[in-house]
Amino acid sequence: MIRFQPITTSDVQHYKFMEELLVESFPPEEYRELEHLREYTDRIGNFHNNIIFDDDLPIGFITYWDFDEFYYVEHFATNPALRNGGYGKRTLEHLCEFLKRPIVLEVESPVEEMAKRRINFYQRHGFTLWEKDYYQPPYKEEIGRASCR
C-alpha cells in the first residue's frame, strides 16, 4: 500500500535517499541548492517533503507546497530500479486521495521526448496540460529560467 511519510533532515537515512534520488532524477537547473532545500524542509511550514513507501519499501519521494487553495507539486520521482512497475500511477492515485484540493504539477515544455512522455503520463492519470508557455524563475541564481507548461 502506498503511503507518504513526512521527513526532515534529522531523518538522515530517508533524507539521504531523497537527496540522492533528486540529484539522479533531475538536471541541476530543475532543483534548488541542496542547502536551501534542507532549510525549506526543516523550516517552511507549507513545504512538505515526503518519502513514498510501498508498505515498508521506500520507492521514491514527493515534495509539494500547500498554498491554501491548491497544492503545488515541486518534485516527484521514483527509484529508477522500480520505474515502469505501476508505482507512479499508484502514487498519483494516493496523492489525489490524500490532498483534498486541486493539485498543480509542472512539466517542461513538450520539446524533448522525455518531456512528452512525462506529459502523457500525467494526462493518462487525469491531469490536464495548460497549453500556454511560461517561464519558471530559476532555482539557482547562475542558471537561467526554464520554459514550462
Give the positions of each predicted feature:
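Conserved N-terminal entry element of GNAT/NAT acetyltransferase domains
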Residues: 1-13
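Active-site rim helix/loop that mediates acceptor-substrate recognition in acyltransferases
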Residues: 26-54
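Conserved beta-strand in the GNAT
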Residues: 49-51, 56-77
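Conserved acetyl-CoA-binding loop-helix of GNAT-fold acetyltransferases
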Residues: 78, 84-97
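Short glycine/proline-centered loop/turn elements that form peptide/ligand docking sites
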Residues: 92, 116-118, 135-141
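Conserved GNAT acetyl-CoA-binding A-motif
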Residues: 99-113
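Conserved active-site alpha-helix within GNAT-family acetyltransferase domains
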Residues: 109-132
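Conserved small/polar residues in nucleotide/adenosyl-binding loops
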Residues: 146-148
